[in-house]
Amino acid sequence: MAERILKNISSRGLKNALRGNDYRKEASISYGILLGGYIVFQILTTAGLIGHNLQGQFVPICVYVSLAISLNLVVGISGELSLGHAGFMAVGAFSGILMSRILGQSMSFEPAIIIISMLFGALIASLAGFVIGIPILGLRGDYLAIVTLAFGEIIRNFMNVLYFGFDSNGRLRFAFNHTIDDVANNDRIITGAIGATGTKTMATFTWGLLLCLFTVFVVLNLKNSKQGRAIMSIRDNRIAGESIGLDVRKYKLMAFVVSAALAGMAGCLFGLNYSTLVPVKFNFNTSVLILVFVVLGGVGNIWGGIIAAALLTVLPETFRQFSDYRMLTYAIVLILVMICTYNPAIKARITGVWTKINPFKNRSGGKGKGKKRKSRKEAA
């Protein structure tokens, strides 16, 4: 009996060690890609090998990388399909711009303004995620996707009629009409469909890198925590999770809110990268674009999403003459990915190739299985 207990303890220790080893590998690859890409881009920029137009895409690349990672938390780790990620991005963008303009009245230290604005954008976006998540997370599959899509469109249309500005006394005022009484044009922050104008551009490539590193840190630590394992167990078998007492709604809401907060931070940095930002920028196509990053990078694969987001943000700028066909190309690629995923023959072939090149492949997996079979025979 004692020998069997010791074997169980040692097998659990081995599983925990392997899980920790996988975490370290995934974290090392993700951080390595981000830091390596940052260094390479900086060297190429210093050498004058990157044009001005492509340099202007550095911050959007980082923003989309962060959005892909945060959406992976819902789609890959939680196993739910969300089509409203651009809505949380919009909430964070306009909230962050509003806070930056308020802080700019009395503060000139830009790093503090950026950090506070991003935290404020994350807070408002997480509140939106919490309010939206409570009633809708009882839904599953296509129904949840449709509701999140509707949420994204509601947010965009809400921004089209929202007006913020300072009055003659310096007080912040808002309205849901075409004019704000006693607010001069140069004191308006958000002007309905015209969007936010006069924003001081403070976002830089370095801030984008820090955002990506923070997003990877949060998602990987949540994924490998006790709560993350509960979320993934519910994803794999909801009924089994409920049967052992897991609060399904609580854990799904946790993933949804954290994902919304990270999207809000990314949206804030995106807003601080432009002097003018319009609500139409956060339409349905943006949500689909982020989902494309996740699917092409591999659902649940953090570093794959990083590569996909970076490449698909750079390529339209590189092949600008074909930019009109971008969404058509993404749609075709998505269809091909779905066909390859659900076709047994193609899937088996891809799985065979991936098994050979998988950096997370457990080389001792076969030995472990052999030991397990041997121990069962001894026990019998």
Where would I find each of the regions flagged by the language model?
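Transmembrane alpha-helices and adjacent helix-loop boundaries
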Residues: 2-380
